[in-house]
């Protein structure tokens, strides 16, 4: 009896951080258009496992979003 060929397991490629690299955008609390891409439709900060942002850049991003919220550039809650 012939055996079926072994299948290779599905391997999901790890996304690279959008803020690392030579021409990556700079994280700035005044750039509300960039920051809104990392905030959910309810106004929460999207986790790095979804956005593929590195841990260091995720901390910078969270700090920038919180600063922008405090200054009124971003809303705390989106209804």
From Swiss-Prot:
Any one GO biological process? translation
List the InterPro entries: Ribosomal_bS18, Ribosomal_bS18_CS, Ribosomal_bS18_sf
Q: PROSITE patterns, from UniProt?
A: RIBOSOMAL_S18
Please give an example of a GO cellular component term from this record: cytosolic small ribosomal subunit
Q: Which GO terms describe its molecular function?
A: small ribosomal subunit rRNA binding; structural constituent of ribosome
Keyword rRNA-binding attached = yes
What role does it play? Binds as a heterodimer with protein bS6 to the central domain of the 16S rRNA, where it helps stabilize the platform of the 30S subunit.
- Tell me which family the UniProt entry assigns to this protein: Belongs to the bacterial ribosomal protein bS18 family.
Give the protein's recorded name: Small ribosomal subunit protein bS18
- Where does this protein come from, organism-wise? Bradyrhizobium sp. (strain ORS 278)
Q: Which gene encodes it?
A: rpsR
């Amino acid at each position: 009896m012939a055996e079926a060929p072994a299948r290779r397991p599905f391997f999901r490629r790890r996304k690279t951080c959008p803020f690392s690299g030579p021409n990556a955008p700079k994280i700035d609390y005044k750039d509300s258009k960039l920051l809104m891409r990392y905030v959910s439709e309810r106004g929460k900060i999207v986790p790095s496992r979804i956005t593929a942002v590195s841990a260091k850049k995720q901390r910078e991003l969270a700090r920038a979003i919180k600063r922008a919220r405090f200054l009124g550039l971003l809303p705390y809650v989106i209804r």
